[in-house]
């Protein structure tokens, strides 16, 4: 067996992680982080939540070594309770065996393909990864798994997530809900409060180990240096493409973010994860800047050729993973994503609405035509006309608000940049603050008539665009969909809500805009998700930040975005991992409807020139390629051309319609050709780079075995479902099946368990599901869900702490053999640890021992870790029953679960159990050998995931595993051959 002596800390053996000690009148397990002066302890029969810290020198009674008590033969178990005891032990493990340390702390069941970034990370001394998976595949999950694994391996103690402001709260929730990590949000709004009262030698990032930091807050020169000097060991950067720097006028903010990341990456020992769905937008400088954050030599790929380039490309493949949904097929996981049905649905303005829109276009065209010599004034006036057009096309309410909002003539350069980004839908950093109506009012007297027309329309019925939306929603709701209507402006969202809230019978309608705080938005979404037939009206504050797949399955784009990425973001809120969808033709389906005005020349050109082109590139390449227009020069020129030539364009369109031609064509507009050429060039570059940098090293055959080992070590979905059914039924709170979900009444549970559940905000009657995606409105119950953990810990604590206890149905606790019918049900939370029954699964008397194995895992440069494992061994009588021999074939748990045969006489049952308990000391050599074999297997698992495909063995991966003896014998169960077998 591998020895850990050379890497073990200087601790007394009985203080080492995994050791048993006695203190304060009870037994404890020593947890990692212990020293001679400070012990981190978990009750022997308790949970991680009961852990405490004590100082041995301050204890009245000395802390002493302890041993695990053997089962008490006076409390005997039925087969049913023996199996429940085994399941409770399995579900209680948080520091489980297998190749990964963190899986016992995951609040979900990851898919096999999501293990790839984790395995890539474990092969690197310093983790530097660019994770560029498609929208909805699970980049947040993949990054969180890496962070949790490094934490649980003891390889880091702190980390920070850097992300745009609108994603801060989502990251805080995801880390807590999925990974049991309590992170602190750090934004411009709360940083001063967090810093208040801190000692001068500390700051936020030294006091709070886990932080989620707004990039807008931390990028400034005044804060950047302090963060870099005290930065945690791991940094996760979300939406990394917005931080990569760029050629041209990409904005001061992007360059500040890039400078920050460049300083952070200069520390060669810092772990960094970069997440983006669009790593390459056709801007070679930006893309290679991003690669340079992984390793400084990677930008040389631009200039190297031949073998030198191939070798560097091979090296990059260890740091870069990019997959689309079609790549998931080979992982046998493609069925987890729904089919997306899309449709472009035109509507036509008519009557007063058409007249008003034409008046606005005439006004805007005149502004463009009479542009003066002052370039800045000309630019701002044009942006004002675009803002007005967009608001008018959205709704009368947005038009009124825009016309009443005055554009400042004294804008700073940064304010101008912000206005430009909002007009062209260019920014991805401030979506929640981006849904207010754009200012359009100037000193031009021509606006007065437009204000009057807009106000008159606001009170009119028959809005053609609203009528078209109502028709689409009726169809969606009739087909069983739960839609989200995305619009561009707050005023439009409220306008639609007012018009639709009483339109559909039995439908619950709500509105969510950037006026609400992140917590208020989340609460409103959660409340609407509980409705039987929900309809949500939202601005783009929900196109990022809150996942909607568990309550909604359709998207309507009421307003076109000029940025195709924004459409993908909207649809990606529902079309993602975990979406249940609506079953159509046997397939889970989501639906997306894009509305556009067919007599609106701006909508027409956005649809034909921008959105359809983006879709075509995505379909051909497999990944999205953003429009290569960071400074919006192309879009600006395009819109000017459309306004100046709108009558000609309309005439061409009407002629095409008369000839039955469906697609628009603008071959004579040079600006359209320029945009098309630039975009095709960007797509070709992205296609080339996707081929060059594809991740092909880790294949399913190399990952699936690790996944299967983790499922065996910690339990999978079927194990969780079985345990919950058995435990809740035994405790009087049986599950009530409701289709794909279950109702769980918590009131019948013992008071101790109810109190623990209440502390986790679980009370009353729960609606739960054991599968992903869960039924709408149901909670997904996984192995680390509080319901499972509290049930498992409660049953174990009651059973392991009770040498002589009250008994439940089918069990007896006696000094003398009782009658066969003697039974009691006074404490169903107590499970017997010994039992005896007859079964056809064995031909000779056999003993199945349920064990908890404790190992100490020591890795170079890290604190020792405690690893626990639930296991079972079988011993079979030989030599006429004179001795027991270890069985090395088959699964002992299959024997334990095999159907029972006839009743065993009470006297024989008592004798068999007593004899087995008396032999426990004699079986210790067998148990010791088994534990050491399992320790060697654990070491092999640990080292195997460190083995690199073409990467040298690393110092960081060296490890040793030591079995902690004696083994904990949780249960002893005797199986006798059935009569006549």
Which stretches of residues belong to each language-model region?
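Charged, non-catalytic accessory extensions
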Residues: 1-5, 34, 361-364, 368-483, ...
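Basic/aromatic-rich interaction segments and small domains that mediate binding to polyanionic partners
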Residues: 24-58
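Hydrophobic positions on the alpha1 helix immediately C-terminal to the Walker A/P-loop
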Residues: 142, 146, 286, 468
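Inter-lobe coupling linker of SF2 helicases/translocases
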Residues: 200-201, 207, 211-232, 244-416, ...
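A short beta-strand element within the Helicase C-terminal
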Residues: 231, 286-289, 547-559, 591-593
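Conserved segment of the helicase C-terminal RecA-like domain
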Residues: 574-608
């Amino acid at each position: 067996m591998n020895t850990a002596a050379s890497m073990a800390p200087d601790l007394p053996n009985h203080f080492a992680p995994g050791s048993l000690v006695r203190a304060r009148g009870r037994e404890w397990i020593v947890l990692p982080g212990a020293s001679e002066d400070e012990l981190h302890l978990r009750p022997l029969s308790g949970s991680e939540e009961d852990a405490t810290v004590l100082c041995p020198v301050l204890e009245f009674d000395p802390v002493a070594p302890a041993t695990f008590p053997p089962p008490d033969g006076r409390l005997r178990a039925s087969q049913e309770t023996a199996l429940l005891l085994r399941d409770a032990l399995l579900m209680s493990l948080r520091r489980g065996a297998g190749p990964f340390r963190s899986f016992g702390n995951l609040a979900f069941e990851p898919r096999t393909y999501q293990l790839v970034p984790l395995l890539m990370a474990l092969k690197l001394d310093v983790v530097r990864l660019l994770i560029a998976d498609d929208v909805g595949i699970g980049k947040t999950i993949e990054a969180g798994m890496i962070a949790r694994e490094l934490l649980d391996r003891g390889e880091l103690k702190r980390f920070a997530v850097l992300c745009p402001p609108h994603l801060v709260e989502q990251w805080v929730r995801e880390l807590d809900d999925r990974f049991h990590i309590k992170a602190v949000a750090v934004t411009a709004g709360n940083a001063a409060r967090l810093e208040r009262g801190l000692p001068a030698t500390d700051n936020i990032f030294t006091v709070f180990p886990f932080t989620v930091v707004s990039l807008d807050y931390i990028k400034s020169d005044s804060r950047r240096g302090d963060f870099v000097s005290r930065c945690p060991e791991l940094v996760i950067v979300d939406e990394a493409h917005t931080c990569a720097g760029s050629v041209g006028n990409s904005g001061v903010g992007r360059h500040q973010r890039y400078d920050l990341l460049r300083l952070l990456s200069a520390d060669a020992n810092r772990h960094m994860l970069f997440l983006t769905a669009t790593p390459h937008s056709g801007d070679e400088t930006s893309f290679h800047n991003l690669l340079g954050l992984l390793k400084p030599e990677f930008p040389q790929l631009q200039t190297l050729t031949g073998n030198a380039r191939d070798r560097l490309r091979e090296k990059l493949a260890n740091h870069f993973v990019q997959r689309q949904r079609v790549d998931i097929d080979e992982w046998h996981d493609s069925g987890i994503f729904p089919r997306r049905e899309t449709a472009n649905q035109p509507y036509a303005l008519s009557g007063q609405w058409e007249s008003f829109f034409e008046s606005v276009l005439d006004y805007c065209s005149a502004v463009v035509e009479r542009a003066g010599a002052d370039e800045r004034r000309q630019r701002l006036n044009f942006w004002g006309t675009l803002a007005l057009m967009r608001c008018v096309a959205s709704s009368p309410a947005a038009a009124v608000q825009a016309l009443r909002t005055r554009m400042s003539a004294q804008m700073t350069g940064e304010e101008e940049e912000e206005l430009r980004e909002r007009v062209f839908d260019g920014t991805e950093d401030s979506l929640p603050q981006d849904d207010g109506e754009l200012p359009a009012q100037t000193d031009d007297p021509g606006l007065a008539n437009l204000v009057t027309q807009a106000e008159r329309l606001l009170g009119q019925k028959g809005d053609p665009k609203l009528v078209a939306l109502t028709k689409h929603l009726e169809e969606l709701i009739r087909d069983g969909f739960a839609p989200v209507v995305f619009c561009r402006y707050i005023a439009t969202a409220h306008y639609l809500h007012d018009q639709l809230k009483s339109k559909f019978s039995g439908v619950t309608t709500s509105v969510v805009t950037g006026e609400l705080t992140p917590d208020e938005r989340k609460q409103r979404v959660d409340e609407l998700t509980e409705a039987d037939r929900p309809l949500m009206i939202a601005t783009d504050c929900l196109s990022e930040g809150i996942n909607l797949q568990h309550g909604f399955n359709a998207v309507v784009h009421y307003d076109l975005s000029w940025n195709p990425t924004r459409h993908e973001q909207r649809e990606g809120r529902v079309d993602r991992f975990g979406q249940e969808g609506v079953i159509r033709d046997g397939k889970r389906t989501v639906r997306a409807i894009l509305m556009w005005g067919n007599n609106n020349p701006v909508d027409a050109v956005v649809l034909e020139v921008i959105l359809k082109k983006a879709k075509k590139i995505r379909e051909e390449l497999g990944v999205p390629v953003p429009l290569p227009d960071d400074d919006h020069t192309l879009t600006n020129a395009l819109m000017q051309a459309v306004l100046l030539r709108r009558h000609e364009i309309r005439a061409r369109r009407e002629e095409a319609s008369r000839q039955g031609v469906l697609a628009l064509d603008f071959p004579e507009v040079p600006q359209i050709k320029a945009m098309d050429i630039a975009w095709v060039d960007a797509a070709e570059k992205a296609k080339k780079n996707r081929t060059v940098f594809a991740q092909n090293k880790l294949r399913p055959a190399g990952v699936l075995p690790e996944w299967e080992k983790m499922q065996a070590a910690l339990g999978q979905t079927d194990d969780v479902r079985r345990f919950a059914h058995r435990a809740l039924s035994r405790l009087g709170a049986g599950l009530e099946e409701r289709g794909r979900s279950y109702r769980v009444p918590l009131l019948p549970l013992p008071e101790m368990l109810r109190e623990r559940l209440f502390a986790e905000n679980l009370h009353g009657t729960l609606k739960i599901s054991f599968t992903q995606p869960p039924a709408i409105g149901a909670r997904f119950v996984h192995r680390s869900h509080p319901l499972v953990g509290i049930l498992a810990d409660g049953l174990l604590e009651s059973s392991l702490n009770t040498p002589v206890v009250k008994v439940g149905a089918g069990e007896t606790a006696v000094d003398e053999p009782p009658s066969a019918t003697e039974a009691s049900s006074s404490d169903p939370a107590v499970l017997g640890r010994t039992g005896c029954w007859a079964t056809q699964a064995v031909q000779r008397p056999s003993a199945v021992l349920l064990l908890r194995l404790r190992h100490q895992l020591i890795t170079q440069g890290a604190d020792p870790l405690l690893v626990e494992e639930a296991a079972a061994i079988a011993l079979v009588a030989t030599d006429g029953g004179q001795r027991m021999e270890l069985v090395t074939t088959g699964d002992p748990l299959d024997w334990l679960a095999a159907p029972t045969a006839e009743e065993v006489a009470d006297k024989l049952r008592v004798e068999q159990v007593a004899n087995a308990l008396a032999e426990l000391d004699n079986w210790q050599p067998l148990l010791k050998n088994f534990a050491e074999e399992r320790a060697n297997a654990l070491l092999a698992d640990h080292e195997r995931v460190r083995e690199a495909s073409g990467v040298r063995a690393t110092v960081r991966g060296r490890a040793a595993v030591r079995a902690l003896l004696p083994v904990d014998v949780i249960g002893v169960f005797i199986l006798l051959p059935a009569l006549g077998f």
